[in-house]
Amino acid sequence: MWVFKFLLLPVVSFALSPEETLDTQWELWKKTHGKQYNSKVDEISRRLIWEKNLKKISVHNLEASLGAHTYELAMNHLGDMTSEEVVQKMTGLRVPPSRSFSNDTLYTPEWEGRVPDSIDYRKKGYVTPVKNQGQCGSCWAFSSAGALEGQLKKKTGKLLALSPQNLVDCVSENYGCGGGYMTTAFQYVQQNGGIDSEDAYPYVGQDESCMYNATAKAAKCRGYREIPVGNEKALKRAVARVGPVSVSIDASLTSFQFYSRGVYYDENCDRDNVNHAVLVVGYGTQKGNKYWIIKNSWGESWGNKGYVLLARNKNNACGITNLASFPKM
């Protein structure tokens, strides 16, 4: 009997101190991601958000273990932010009000011939390392630069990081860290006669004066093509035949904020309200679930080393084909 009570002690002790466990997790999370706060009040409010997010992650993963979801979540560097804050500070898609489709820029796929069942341009050397846009609405610049990098590799055989900051500072028809649009960026590169390399024009994550240097020009563009809205078959053809494609999605959900692995599909993801620009770098199938390989610009500590597998052929999930385009080089 005494032995039984003794064995229970550690269990009871642990059960009575969940706050200590949370304290330890919070301190470790802050240290891991270099978090510092201006005041104790600020830290308390941020911790409450973090705890709420942690609970959502735990509940989701329990449901996933029971087969309710095809993807898992994990805590990351965005843990002390609400999903509303993430959209406000870390997206940045801003479509021009006067934008309209033109037959001159519409992509018409060549439907003859098969395309691969899967393709991953990371393995083909078309994709530069994942970047972090920080709290600047420059997703459009990273998406555009990534698509240009893919075409540069295809044309020259060389992979070179191009400058999102060049686009942030110099595309006058966009709004820098206040947001922008990918085809506007492609038009700028075409009319400007080029875009600088990342090394020549490094990213600083804020609006600066345009410092484009023609002698540091690393790539040109001779126009762009837009994928027909809602047509995932056309997007697949474009990815297979052309290369990485700039797209927009709804990134407003907590499930996207903390995506970790698996094929992301959330029925609440709003295909009619896209707000974030990313890059499709391939497609495939996992355990019977078709997906797009998406390169994000929230750093390697987000998602699966900076990437998400987004559900493919699931009724335009998250609006992935609403604003898809690629540059011509």
UniProtKB/Swiss-Prot annotation:
Annotated S-S bridges: 136-177, 170-210, 269-318
Q: Where in the cell is it found?
A: Lysosome; Secreted; Apical cell membrane
Gene3D superfamilies under this entry?
Cysteine proteinases
In which domain of life is the source organism classified? Eukaryota
| Signal peptide stretch | 1-15
E.C. number: 3.4.22.38
The active site annotation covers 139, 276, 296
What broad class describes the main subcellular location of this protein? other
GO MF annotation list: collagen binding; cysteine-type endopeptidase activity; cysteine-type peptidase activity; fibronectin binding; proteoglycan binding
This protein's record includes keyword Ubl conjugation: no
Q: Which reaction does it catalyse?
A: Broad proteolytic activity. With small-molecule substrates and inhibitors, the major determinant of specificity is P2, which is preferably Leu, Met > Phe, and not Arg
Q: Supply the SMART domains for this chain.
A: Inhibitor_I29 (SM00848), Pept_C1 (SM00645)
Q: Keywords for this entry? A: Cell membrane, Disulfide bond, Glycoprotein, Hydrolase, Lysosome, Membrane, Protease, Secreted, Signal, Thiol protease, Zymogen
Question: How does this protein lie in the membrane?
Answer: Peripheral membrane protein
Alphabetical GO CC annotations of the entry are: apical plasma membrane; external side of plasma membrane; extracellular space; lysosome
Enzyme class comes to hydrolase
Q: Which family does it belong to?
A: Belongs to the peptidase C1 family.
PANTHER family, from UniProt?
A: CYSTEINE PROTEASE FAMILY C1-RELATED
Name it: Cathepsin K
Species, as recorded: Rattus norvegicus (Rat)
- Gene symbol of the encoding locus: Ctsk
